[in-house]
Swiss-Prot record, chain B:
Appears to be allosterically activated by the binding of pArg-containing polypeptides to the pArg-binding pocket localized in the C-terminal domain of McsB. NCBIfam families: PRK01059.1-4 (NF002194). This is Protein-arginine kinase. Its EC number is 2.7.14.1. It comes from Desulforamulus reducens (strain ATCC BAA-1160 / DSM 100696 / MI-1) (Desulfotomaculum reducens). A motif (RDXXRA motif of the pArg binding pocket involved in allosteric regulation) lies at residues 339-344. GO terms for molecular function: ATP binding; creatine kinase activity; protein kinase activity. Disulfide bonds: none annotated. Keywords: Allosteric enzyme, ATP-binding, Kinase, Nucleotide-binding, Transferase. It catalyses: L-arginyl-[protein] + ATP = N(omega)-phospho-L-arginyl-[protein] + ADP + H(+).
Length: 170, 357
């Protein structure tokens, strides 16, 4: 086999790349291989984030990153996006996808972020119970501190406030 | 300043070298990804719905209370701008290159000093950005947070209790917050410490990129460091982490500069003055060469080797010498060779005007 690039010397380096289920193979002689590697990243184009994520999601759905046959077709009722589409683009079609298709991606979120529970900002007007849950979280931290510094009166009032809020959640 | 004036002026508020730690940190940026409840995400959004999102955002930014809190915000549709003007907004970091595709679906909200910008229908319905000079991540977050609160008065966001703000890409869910600092690290590069530093950053859950985002090279020794994780941490935790790391980088870069200045004074002075000489007198100049020389010159300014040059001029010249900006100033499309000539001319004129001041 001759080198794909110079078509003169025999191919000694065989380079296979799989991105998004498409397989690319290059057969190069050692001279061309080292030139390409030294010259630029063009030899192994930088994986963009979406391709990478699509690969991860695909792997998650199918249990394999190179399987190319039909994916299980769970579909979002709201926007019609299928798992296959999500796996291909790395993007969800709408916010409903998170509760429809997203359930199955939850472990993946944990893998990306190291956590799967939001602890940050909550929209004031539409946050609903999330806002109360956040306040409880903050109060529980304050309670710990109050106990630590033996401010028991303060601790008691924080505890009452937490109880009150927890009732609202039920 | 109107949007038309914004694209005619190479100077942005965030280029002022007035912020804290500005000898190393060029700028700070906070971006919040938000989506409207009930609409498909932009990559599958039809024209009619895209229009509805644009209208919703237009009325949300026009609220009196929001304008009172953060100043005058105005939405322009991408179709109202020429292709060169759109490209200039990219070169000024006010919109991403993705915004250039399908302009009929997209819009941009700008405050006239360019500190606040909101991309509409990019990867998410809203990308609220705040950009300030130097290390001002907290200030950026406060401002973005205020804009976010203001928009939320009218707009129903896609939000879930457990996953937080829902975004089209799962790497952004939770806080939807991406904070970044742009650093000038010439001494860490020269002393070959940069690779060790970059490896450490990736272990801390941070991403490093070049000046123009994902996949771009760190030309001109400019590096963008940003958080990777957006879910499971509070906004304040994310910001604090990044500030701590940025300050560490500042300390290390300064130490490397001092060492270079002490141990290789002649080499450094030679490098700086050669860069200054080329920028001041060369007749053609490629974009990459410009970035490298401006980086050397800025190092000279920061080390006190060259005096009388405002540090902000370096970023101003970088923006000025980008392809679309050159075409805009010239008033005509330029081929790469003509661009190199015109770039050298503009830089020369700007630097000579400084020495005459």
């Amino acid at each position: 086999m001759l080198c794909d690039r110079c078509q003169k010397r025999p191919a000694e380096v065989h380079f296979t790349q799989i991105i998004n289920n498409s397989k690319k193979q290059m057969n190069l002689c050692s001279t061309c291989a080292s030139e390409l590697q030294a010259g630029s990243l063009g030899f192994a184009p930088q994986l963009n984030l979406h391709d990478f994520l699509a690969g991860l999601i695909n792997h998650h759905f199918t249990g394999s990153s190179i399987q190319t046959n039909a994916l299980p077709q769970m579909r979002c009722e709201k926007c019609g996006s299928t798992e296959a589409q999500v796996a291909k683009t790395g993007l969800f079609g709408c916010s409903e996808c998170y509760s429809q298709i997203g359930e199955r991606v939850r472990p993946l979120l944990k893998r990306i972020h190291g956590s799967s529970i939001h602890t940050g900002k909550v929209p004031k007007r539409t946050g609903g119970t999330a806002l109360i849950a956040k306040e409880i979280r903050i109060l529980k931290n304050q309670l710990q501190n109050a106990i630590k510094y033996e401010e028991f009166e303060e601790a008691a009032s924080i505890r009452d406030r937490i109880k009150e809020l927890e009732q609202k959640l039920q | 300043m109107s949007l038309k004036e914004t694209v005619s002026n190479p100077y942005s508020k965030w280029l002022e070298a007035t912020g804290p730690e500005n000898d190393v940190i060029i700028s700070s940026r906070v971006r919040l990804a938000r989506n409207l409840m009930g609409y498909p995400f932009p990559h599958v959004l039809g024209h009619e719905n895209a229009d509805k999102v644009l209208y919703a955002v237009q009325s949300a930014v026009a609220q009196k209370s929001l304008q009172e809190a953060v100043g005058n915000l105005e939405l322009s549709r991408m179709t109202e701008l020429s292709s060169i003007e759109r490209q200039i907004l990219v070169e000024k970091h006010l919109i991403s290159p993705d915004m250039l595709e399908q302009p009929e679906k997209r819009g941009v909200v700008l405050r006239d000093d360019e500190v606040i910008s909101i991309m509409v229908n990019e990867e998410d319905h809203l990308r609220i950005q705040c950009l300030l000079p130097g290390l001002q991540l907290k200030e950026c977050w406060d401002l973005a947070n205020t804009v976010d609160d203001g928009l939320e008065q009218i707009i129903d966001y896609a939000f879930a209790k457990e996953q937080g703000y829902l975004t089209s890409c799962p790497t952004n869910i939770g806080t939807g917050l991406r904070a970044s600092v742009m650093l000038h690290l010439p001494a860490l590069v020269m002393t070959r410490q940069i690779n060790a530093v970059l490896t450490t950053l990736s272990k801390l859950g941070l991403t490093v990129r070049g000046l123009y985002g994902e996949g771009t090279q760190a030309t001109g020794n400019l590096f963008q460091v940003s958080n990777q994780v957006t879910l499971g941490l509070t906004e304040e935790e994310i910001i604090d982490n990044l500030i701590t790391v940025a300050l560490q980088l500042v300390t290390q870069e300064r130490a490397a500069r001092r060492a270079l200045h002490k141990e290789q004074l002649h080499q450094i002075e030679d490098k700086v003055w050669r860069a200054y000489g080329l920028l001041k007198y060369a007749r053609t100049m490629t974009s990459n060469e410009t970035m490298t020389l401006l980086s050397d010159m800025r190092l000279g300014v920061d080390l006190g080797v060259i005096t009388g040059i405002p540090p902000g001029i370096i970023m101003e010249l970088i923006i000025l010498s980008r392809p679309a900006f050159l075409s805009k100033v010239k008033g005509a499309d330029l081929n790469p060779y003509q661009r190199d000539i015109f770039r050298a001319t503009l830089i020369r004129e700007r630097l000579n005007s400084l020495s005459n001041e």
